[in-house]
């Protein structure tokens, strides 16, 4: 890594430590030319697959869109933000684990419903009613009956 002070090419690592619960590495480095010390952080760059919408439009995966959809369903429900973040991370892990460059938006919707079902049944019904375009109260009842099985 180049020295940020003298721009020399050669630096050495003096110390490395895991930070952020093991998700990144903090390194102390020293320039071999000017002897200045500096800190770097190393994080794995994980590429998410692109999303193929139902109309065949392709767009980059948008974590914020995923989060806002889940939070809308979970509004005023007793679910912690930590639990929501864990669910989002689980969905992202499942998407990466497919190994595909593109995934259908329907797959993401199904993964969201799976996580919401575990977090909060009311939020699950809210999300499912919009996602599956429930037309009447009968469809709500059928979905609730499936939950009780």
UniProtKB/Swiss-Prot annotation:
<keyword id="KW-0804">Transcription</keyword>
<feature type="zinc finger region">
    <location>
        <begin position="3"/>
        <end position="34"/>
    </location>
</feature>
<dbReference type="InterPro" id="IPR003796">
    <property type="entry name" value="RNR_NrdR-like"/>
</dbReference>
<dbReference type="GO" id="GO:0008270">
    <property type="term" value="F:zinc ion binding"/>
</dbReference>
<comment type="function">
    <text>Negatively regulates transcription of bacterial ribonucleotide reductase nrd genes and operons by binding to NrdR-boxes.</text>
</comment>
<dbReference type="Pfam" id="PF22811">
    <property type="entry name" value="Zn_ribbon_NrdR"/>
</dbReference>
<keyword id="KW-0547">Nucleotide-binding</keyword>
<keyword id="KW-0805">Transcription regulation</keyword>
<dbReference type="GO" id="GO:0003677">
    <property type="term" value="F:DNA binding"/>
</dbReference>
<protein>
    <recommendedName>
        <fullName>Transcriptional repressor NrdR</fullName>
    </recommendedName>
</protein>
<dbReference type="InterPro" id="IPR055173">
    <property type="entry name" value="NrdR-like_N"/>
</dbReference>
<keyword id="KW-0862">Zinc</keyword>
<keyword id="KW-0238">DNA-binding</keyword>
<comment type="similarity">
    <text>Belongs to the NrdR family.</text>
</comment>
<dbReference type="GO" id="GO:0005524">
    <property type="term" value="F:ATP binding"/>
</dbReference>
<dbReference type="GO" id="GO:0045892">
    <property type="term" value="P:negative regulation of DNA-templated transcription"/>
</dbReference>
<dbReference type="Pfam" id="PF03477">
    <property type="entry name" value="ATP-cone"/>
</dbReference>
<feature type="domain" description="ATP-cone">
    <location>
        <begin position="49"/>
        <end position="139"/>
    </location>
</feature>
<dbReference type="InterPro" id="IPR005144">
    <property type="entry name" value="ATP-cone_dom"/>
</dbReference>
<keyword id="KW-0678">Repressor</keyword>
<keyword id="KW-0067">ATP-binding</keyword>
<keyword id="KW-0479">Metal-binding</keyword>
<keyword id="KW-0863">Zinc-finger</keyword>
């Amino acid at each position: 890594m180049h020295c940020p002070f003298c721009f020399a090419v050669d630096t050495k690592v003096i110390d490395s430590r895991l930070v952020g619960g093991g998700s990144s590495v903090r390194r102390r480095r020293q320039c071999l030319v000017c002897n200045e010390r500096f800190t770097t952080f190393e994080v794995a760059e994980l590429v998410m697959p692109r999303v193929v919408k139902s109309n065949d439009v392709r767009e980059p995966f948008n974590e914020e869109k995923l989060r806002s959809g889940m939070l809308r369903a979970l509004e005023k429900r007793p679910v912690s933000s930590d639990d929501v973040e864990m669910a989002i991370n689980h969905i992202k892990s499942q998407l990466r684990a497919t190994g595909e460059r593109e995934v259908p938006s329907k797959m993401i919707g199904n993964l969201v419903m799976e996580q919401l079902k575990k977090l909060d049944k009311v939020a699950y019904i809210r999300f499912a009613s919009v996602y599956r375009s429930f037309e009447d109260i009968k469809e709500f009842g059928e979905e609730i009956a499936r939950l009780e099985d």
